[in-house]
A protein has these predicted regions:
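Short amphipathic, positively biased membrane-proximal segments
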Residues: 1-157
Length: 157
């Protein structure tokens, strides 16, 4: 979105455009977060008893639980902070230099709020990437047909 915002000459108009786009994206992001949590809860109830898992699998399962929690907490926190930030000016017209940086005309409170929002967004991305990595490791470590490394599956033949 940042390259397209360079065509908007007024800093307050850039804020309106960015906040309007994020409001629409927020609904989709909320649905995605709900689906992630529902999928995690469903898979968690259907998993093997902890006693039947290897120590590595137990550790990965705990890491996945922590990563899902981090994705949920940072996602909700970013959503709340985004709504607060957008509400600092009528129609979300907080002066922005681009999609990520406050304009010089932004108040100190607005600048701090934007920096917090950027930090929460980065933490949310990092937690989502961590979750993807843990899920990949679990897929490799998991027992049963269709799981484990290819090398291990093919060496059985």
């Amino acid at each position: 979105m940042n390259p397209a915002l360079s065509a908007v000459s007024d800093a307050c108009e850039r804020g309106k455009v960015v906040n309007a786009a994020w409001r629409r994206y927020g609904a989709i992001n909320s649905l995605a977060l709900a689906a992630l949590i529902a999928g995690w809860a469903g898979s968690r109830t259907g998993e093997a008893d902890r006693k039947r898992l290897s120590p590595r699998e137990q550790g990965l399962r705990s890491a996945r639980d922590a990563a899902v929690a981090a994705v949920a907490v940072t996602g909700v926190a970013a959503g709340i902070q985004g709504v607060r930030f957008s509400g600092m000016e009528p129609e979300g017209a907080v002066p922005l230099e681009n999609g990520s940086e406050p304009d010089a005309g932004a108040s100190p409170d607005e600048s701090r709020a934007k920096r917090r929002l950027n930090l929460l967004g980065a933490l949310h991305l990092a937690s989502a990437l961590t979750l993807a990595g843990v899920n990949a490791a679990l897929r490799e470590a998991g027992p049963g047909p269709g799981t484990g490394s290819r090398r291990r599956r093919f060496s059985r033949r």
